[in-house]
Every structure is written in structure tokens, then in C-alpha cells.
Swiss-Prot record:
Record note on domains: The homodimer has 2 functional domains, a central cleft essential for production of soluble RbcL in which the RbcL peptide binds, and a polar surface which plays a role in correct RbcL subunit arrangement.
Entries under Pfam families matching the protein: RbcX
Predominant cellular place of this UniProt entry's protein: other
Organism: Thermosynechococcus vestitus (strain NIES-2133 / IAM M-273 / BP-1)
Protein's recorded name: RuBisCO chaperone RbcX
Length: 126
């Protein structure tokens, strides 16, 4: 297991997600202050894949550099706000999700075992 590679890929995914959130934030801000630009950014976003945040921003900078810089600023602000909470929330979230999965699997296994016992009791002649 290459932990460094996993960390890099996780970081890339998180950066793209924060880019997505920054775009949503800017679209919302523009909807209140400049509806035509909000509509333009919304349409641009529907045409350009935001899956890779960096490629999305490169395309946006070619079209509307000021919006690109605005999204960079919002993304950086979001990263600063989230960074303090993320490690503990990640650990707690994984632990909780794993616990729920284990409980559900145990319930399924128990139900299957009970069904097998009931079926074997029905098949046993008395």
C-alpha cells in the first residue's frame, strides 16, 4: 500500500471538491449581485467538467479571468475553514460508517443463520 500516493490522490479529490463548492458559492453570490454573470457561470459550469477542478479553472481563466481569481479566493477560504476540522471529522466519520456497516452485516448474517436453522428444523422428521 502506497500511503503517499493515496494521500496525494485524496488531496487532489478534496481540492476538486472545494473548487466545486467555491463555484457554487460564487454562483450564489452572483445571483444576488449580478444575475447575468451568475447565469453565465452556471452555463459554463454545465458545459465544462468540474470533476478535475484544476482543468475547470484553466478553462475558466481563458474565458473570465476575474471569475477564476474569485473562485480561487473562495476555495482558499473554504480550505482554511475546513482544514482544522477535517482530520478529526474524517476519523470519526470513518469509524461511524464502519460501525454501521459491521452492524448491518452482522444483522444479515444472523438473519441468514436463523433462516437456515428454521429450514433445517422443518426438514427434520420427528
Amino acid at each position: 500500500m502506497d500511503v503517499k500516493h493515496i494521500a496525494k490522490q485524496t488531496t487532489k479529490t478534496l481540492i476538486s471538491y472545494l473548487t466545486y463548492q467555491a463555484v457554487r458559492t460564487v454562483i450564489g453570490q452572483l445571483a444576488e449581485t449580478d444575475p447575468p454573470r451568475s447565469l453565465w457561470l452556471h452555463q459554463f459550469t454545465s458545459q465544462e467538467s468540474i470533476q478535475d477542478g484544476e482543468r475547470y479553472l484553466e478553462a475558466l481563466f481563458r474565458e473570465q479571468p476575474d471569475l477564476g481569481f474569485r473562485i480561487l479566493t473562495v476555495r482558499e477560504h473554504l480550505a482554511e475553514m475546513v482544514a482544522d476540522y477535517l482530520p478529526e471529522m474524517l476519523r470519526a466519520g470513518i469509524q461511524q460508517a464502519n460501525l454501521q456497516q459491521r452492524c448491518q452485516q452482522l444483522e444479515r448474517m444472523t438473519q441468514v443463520s436463523e433462516a437456515n436453522v428454521e429450514n433445517s428444523n422443518l426438514e427434520t422428521p420427528e
